[in-house]
């Protein structure tokens, strides 16, 4: 229902307009206060790059963060990552991730980024505290990438990157809750780069698509072509589950059942195993896998996806980030 409201297919969005006006007024006032320096943002001693969204819901932001960190690492740059840690609750903040950190403590996305990149990752509701925690333990870090936080103006940033869904784009264009917007589309004029996940990119936008890899068994780490798996049941606890289901079908899988879950939803063995009958195979996202690995069964698999970006604007962005980081 929410997708129909945000896309404009359902007229119910009109009933929510008063709340959207209030949301827009408050969010605009907050940004203006920082712009006029009525509120002061904390500036890190090294460059900060924000990778965020203008809309609620999954746009492929986390794969972009992983891709960006890996690209900078390949250029010899030491990168740190900070996040709010949605879906997690640590005993205290900031929390610097280690191999023992669970998704219950840090959230699924920070754990995934840490496992994929090996970069220092810290979470905190106050992102400046997360930056300080990284620099205290890793003073050689040259640049910080913040996963989400475009609207977290308390942390000053040097580069802003926005990821948008190239198919859904901005829906009906209204602020939450009548529409999907955290900020209006005009905000794109002030950011440094716009990455478009799928669809047809417009002039100046960086095209991106998600490339699926081989399926990975949660218990053994064995890899195989996902199309070889039979009697598949799939779950997806991401911002936009239909994208993952469509990816599986593109890979030649016809799931017997597709189960969308809430983004950042906590998972346990009883709930997940109840979704799979005898003889069926469970396939999930990598983001779900980091929550399920500790109690996974033999027939549980995940399908990793990697961001693939291209174009002249991408080369300019990487050159800009490399230059910024090299100065520190």
From Swiss-Prot:
Keywords: ATP-binding, Kinase, Lipid A biosynthesis, Lipid biosynthesis, Lipid metabolism, Nucleotide-binding, Transferase
NCBIfam families: lpxK
Gene: lpxK
Catalyzed reactions per annotation: a lipid A disaccharide + ATP = a lipid IVA + ADP + H(+)
EC code: 2.7.1.130
Organism: Escherichia coli O81 (strain ED1a)
An individual GO BP term: lipopolysaccharide core region biosynthetic process
Protein name as annotated: Tetraacyldisaccharide 4'-kinase
Family: Belongs to the LpxK family.
Enzyme class: transferase
């Amino acid at each position: 229902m929410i997708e129909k409201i945000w896309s404009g297919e359902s007229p119910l969005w009109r009933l929510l307009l008063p709340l959207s006006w209030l949301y827009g007024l408050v969010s605009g006032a907050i940004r203006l206060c920082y712009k006029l320096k009525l509120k002061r943002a904390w500036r890190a001693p090294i460059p900060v790059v924000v990778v965020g969204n203008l809309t609620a819901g999954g746009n492929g932001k986390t794969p972009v963060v992983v891709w960006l960190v890996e690209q900078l690492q390949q250029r010899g740059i030491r990168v740190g990552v900070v996040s709010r840690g949605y879906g997690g609750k640590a005993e205290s903040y900031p929390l610097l991730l280690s191999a023992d950190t669970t998704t219950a403590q840090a959230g699924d996305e920070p754990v995934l980024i840490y496992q994929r990149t090996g970069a220092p990752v810290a979470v905190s509701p106050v992102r400046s505290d997360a930056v300080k925690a990284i620099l205290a333990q890793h003073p050689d870090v040259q640049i910080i990438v913040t996963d989400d936080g475009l609207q977290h103006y308390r942390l000053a940033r040097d580069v802003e990157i926005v990821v948008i869904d190239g198919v859904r784009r901005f829906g009906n264009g209204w602020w939450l809750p009548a529409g999907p917007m955290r900020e209006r589309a005009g905000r794109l004029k002030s950011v440094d780069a716009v990455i478009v996940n799928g669809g047809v990119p417009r002039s100046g936008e960086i095209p991106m698509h998600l490339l699926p890899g081989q399926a990975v068994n949660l218990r053994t780490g064995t890899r195989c072509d996902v199309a070889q798996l039979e009697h598949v049941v799939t779950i997806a606890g991401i911002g936009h589950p239909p994208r993952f289901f469509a990816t599986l079908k593109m890979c030649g899988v016809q799931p017997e059942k597709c189960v969308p879950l809430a983004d950042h939803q906590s998972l346990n063995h009883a709930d997940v195993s109840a979704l799979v009958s005898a003889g069926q195979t469970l396939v999930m996202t990598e983001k779900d896998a980091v929550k399920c690995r500790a109690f996974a069964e033999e027939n549980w698999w995940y399908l990793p996806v990697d961001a693939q970006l291209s174009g002249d604007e991408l080369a300019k962005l990487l050159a800009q980030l490399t230059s910024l980081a090299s100065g520190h």
